[in-house]
Swiss-Prot record:
The chain crosses the membrane at residues 18-38, 40-60, 83-103, 127-147, 163-183, 197-217, 262-282, 285-305, 334-354, 357-377, 385-405, 412-432, 474-494, 509-529. The lineage of its organism: Bacteria, Bacillati, Chloroflexota, Chloroflexia, Chloroflexales. This is Protoheme IX farnesyltransferase. The gene is ctaB. One of its GO terms (biological process) is heme O biosynthetic process. The keyword NADP does not apply. It is a multi-pass membrane protein. Pathway: Porphyrin-containing compound metabolism; heme O biosynthesis; heme O from protoheme: step 1/1. In the C-terminal section; belongs to the UbiA prenyltransferase family. Protoheme IX farnesyltransferase subfamily.
Amino acid sequence: MRRENARVVALPLFRTSWMVIALALVAYGAILAGSIIPTMTGAAVSSIATAVLGGALAMYTGMRTRAAPVRLGGRATAARRSYLTLAFAAVGMLYLAVVAGALNTSAGTLWTCQTWPGCEASGSGDWPALAHRGLAGVATILIAALAMQTWRIRHERALRVAVACALGLMLVQNIVGLVQVLLAQAGESLPLAVARLTHLGLSATAWGALVVLVTLALRRPFPSVVAAPSPATVARPGLTDTTLLEGKPSLLKDYVSLTKPGVISLLILTTITSMYITPAGIPEWSLVLWTTIGGWLMASGSHSINCYLDKDIDINMGRTSRRPIPSGRIPAWHALALGVVLGMIAFAILAIFVNMLTALLALAGFFYYVVIYTIWLKRTSKHNIVIGGGAGAFPPLVGWAAVTGSLAPEALLLWLIVFFWTPPHFWALALIREKDYARAGVPMLPVVAGDVETRRQIVLYTLSMLALTALPPLLGMLGWSYLLMASIFGGLFLYYALKLRRDGTTATAWALYKYSLLYLALLFVAMVVDRAVFA
């Protein structure tokens, strides 16, 4: 009888939100406390507390969310099952990673691996530390895949916020884990202890966000193949639950488009090729990989901020009015936040895995493009492309500095080649989009000086560029095979420029614009071929 009375009193108390929140806070504190206890007891405390934290958050989320089951067709049922399988896999993998980290900390094996992301053992027992990293890596991949699926087929704000928090926290805690490795090389210290707590705290918070996501996914209705448009789909014309399940269009694609990946591809090509023509010889693949990742993210960040700053221009231009921000599919501040975050991550990657000079050069290109070109010159001067083109010429400097750790006259020559390539390339497009630029109030050269003067300037800059491309063999930088290839490619460039000067048709402008993209790629590839085959 007494036991029944206790149950009647205790259960209503336990169902209240504040009790569950208190339980979650206690569990979170126990997770952090477990990392301080230098025995296996600490690992047990952290592991159990992590499970309790997940249970408390699941309970609280369930209490605050009304279950709304729906009948689904076979296709939607399969999609829901696949989504939940991925979500549970991510939750389970992250829990194992947290437990493995706690075990390593308690056993004192966390710092046996003195490198990252691989493992260069400094003592015995390195496999537990490497296993922890492997679990964390797999968890990160699963969370990233879950984020892509969530943005693709789920339009509920709560689910998207939860998965975004989980992915963001996971990426940050990975960076903190790297910082721990660097700090551990100097032995135990206060910064290392702080980093250890931060690392575990971020992991536990990411785990909590995933638990909330899974609970919401279980209780919220899954989009059916034939469902009425929701407010989220109404805000995005043409997007229904059917197209969400089919993945067209997707918000993920919109966010990727903010970074202008097509433009970045050519920039990164000049970065990579410049790495293979330095006096230092062929670089290690890992150096090329980290330089590529850092350079790509830095360029992505600058382009995203450019989309934020140019939103008033884009809406007045036919070519850009369908972009995510002017069309209303993405809030403008998202582009700004994305750009800042990508820039910070890129700088950290380049500074840690490449060298500080490379990171600073990439950051200089970032600010050159955002501040000097986008904010200042693009809106105020007919020379916006001439001077602003220097931003696109930074990638060869980044590649050269990544390998040599310094800059040389040869690297500056590569910068000049891209600098003088930019005006003919972009003015060809500006001639085609002249009315758009005039309507948006952008003082591009065709708008200010007219078509005839623009075509004349294209020829002049083309001749200057071709003269610069002939200098590498004369300076002993490259051989005569390069000069032969550069002459052929450059001769065709000059042909299109002169043809545009003569007839001024839109078709010729398009031909020059498209060939200019191919030309720059061929020119830098020719440099590598000359060095690799004929040197």
